[in-house]
Amino acid sequence: MLENTNRTLTAAATRLRLYNTATHNTSEFKTVTPGHVGMYVCGATVQSSPHIGHIRAAIAFDVVRRWLLRLGYNVTFVRNVTDIDDKIIKKASENGQTWWQRAYIYEREFTEAYNTLGVMPPTVEPRATGHINDMVELIQRLIDRGHAYAIKSADGNPTGNVYFSVPSWQDYGALTHQNGNSDNNSDGSNGEEKASKSDKYNPIDPADASPDKHDARDFALWKAPCDFDQKDARWNTPFGAGRPGWHIECSAMSHRYLGDAFDIHGGGLDLRFPHHENEMAQTLAAGWKSANVWMHSAWVTAKGEKMSKSLGNGLSVPSVLAQKSAWVVRYALGGVQYRAMLEWSDQALNEAQSAYDRISNFLERAGRVIENQPDYAEVQGVDADNLPEDFTKAMNDDINVSGALAAIFTAIRSDNALLDDYAQSQNESQNDSIKSLIKTCVLQVRAMLDTLGLDPYSPQWRRNAQKSQDLCEDADNGASAEHKALESLIANQLEQRAIARAAKDFARADAIRDSLTAAGVVIEDCAQGSSWHLS
C-alpha cells in the first residue's frame, strides 16, 4: 500500500479504538493533529541476523499503519535502528569486526527481511549514531531541569557517566505501573504478565548496576567506555567521552521527527519495562509530551517459550523462507491480533498455505471472468467506508486481524457463489451485470488483503513472485512458470474434451472430465464454453 498526502478522512476513522498499555484499556483513537498520525516504532538492534520474532513485530505495526492509511489518515512512520550498543561491540570484537561494520551488515539483513515479507519502508529510519547531538542536547536539558546528574571523578573531571534520577520524577511507573523495585502488577492480559521488570526477557543494562548511582532505580543516559569497547565507539561530550545509554536514543529521535507530542509509540512486549518506562519518564521530564497511545505486540513462542537470540531458539528468516513462500510466512506471522501470543509450528505454516491457496484460487478464477485484474491504483482507491462492515468493524476493534481475515473468507465464499451463477447463466445481459459485480467484489477483497499486506497482485508481491517463482501470478498475464505449464496442459485437455463432445463421443468427454476432477481440477460448463479452477 502506497502513502500519499491527498487523503480524505473516512467516516470509519471516527470509530477506531486502540488498546493503550499505559491505561490498560481500549478507547477511541484521537490524533494530535486532525487527519495526521505520527507513529514511532522501536526498530532493530542490529547485532545479528533477524529472526521471525523481530519480523512479527514489524508486520504487526505495518498492519496498524496500513489500516490508518485506509481510514484516510496521513501517516508519518518513524522506525529507528540501534547501531551502537554493548552486544554489537562485543560480538564485533569476537568476530574480528569493527562495531560499525557489524551494524551495517545486519542492518542490511533486517532491511532485506522487511522487504521480502512486505513491510512498507518507514517514512524516516534514523540511526542512533546519526543523532548523537540530539541525545547530548536532551541529556543536558534533563540535567538543567534537575532530572539527571553527571558523575565526576575525585578530582572533579567528568567520567562520561550520566544517570536519570528516578526519584526526581514522581510519575515514574506511569506506563507499566511499577517503580523499578516492585513486582510487575499489570493485569496480565495477552501475556503481559511475562514481561516482568528484570528477567531473561528483559536484561538490565550493565551500566545501570553502577555503584555511582544515587538511587538503585536510576538508569544510564550516557555511558563511559567499558573495558570491551572499541576505541572509536565513543563520542566526546561535556559529560566526558562515551556513548548513549539504552533508552535516550528513542526519546531524542522521536522528538526530532515527530515533535513535542505524537500519537502512537509501538514496540515489542518485552520493551515495556524498562525501556519504554524509562523512555516515557525522560521524555516527560524534559518537558515534552509522551505518545498518546502506547502499543505493544506480543511474542512469537516455540513450545510456550519466547523466541529470542539470547535463549537460542529464534528461527532465522531465511530458514523459514526455505519452507514456504514469503506471502505464506507473512500470513502466518500476521494472521492473529497483535497482542496475542503466536505459537509457531508447522501447522501454522500449513494453515497459512491453505489460506493462500483459497485466496489465489478465487482471484485467479475471478480474473478469468473479468479478463484483467484491477490496477493496484484502483485497489488503493477503495477506502474503509467502501469495505464490508464486518471487516471494518474488526479492524477498528484494536486491529483485530483474526476477525478481519474471517470477513475476507466470508466475502470469498459469497463471491465464489456469484462466480457459480455466472458460469451457469446463459443470459448475456445478466452476465454483464454479474461481471461488473464480480469486479467490485475483487476490488473489495484485494483492498482488504492489501490492508493486511497480503494482496497477491500488489507491486511488492509481484516483485517477490519474479524472485521466488512461488507466489501468485503477476497482474498482467497470470502466473509463475509452473502455473503457465498447468494452464497449458489443462487447456489442451479441455480442447480435446470439446472435440469429443462435438463428435458426440460423450464417453471420452466424460473420461477427460473425470481425470481432471481426480487431479483436483473443477470443470464448469456454460454457454460461453468451459472454464476451470482448482478444487
Residue ranges of predicted features:
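Alpha-helical recognition segments enriched in aromatics with Gly/Pro capping
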Residues: L2-Q47, D62, N133-R368
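Structural preference for alpha-helix termini/caps and helix-kink/transition segments
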Residues: L2-T5, K306, N313-S535
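N-terminal, positively charged nucleic-acid-binding surface of large information/translation enzymes
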Residues: T23-T26, V32-M120, L138, Q528-W532
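Aromatic- and histidine-enriched alpha-helix N-cap/loop-to-helix transition segments
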Residues: R56, G130, G245-E249, I399, ...
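Alpha-helix C-terminal capping/helix-coil junction sites
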Residues: L69, N115, I143-D144, M295, ...
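Short phosphate-binding/catalytic loops that engage adenosine nucleotides
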Residues: Y73, H147, V521
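The substrate-binding groove and active-site-proximal loops of carbohydrate-active enzymes
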Residues: A92-W99, T123-T129, G240, G268
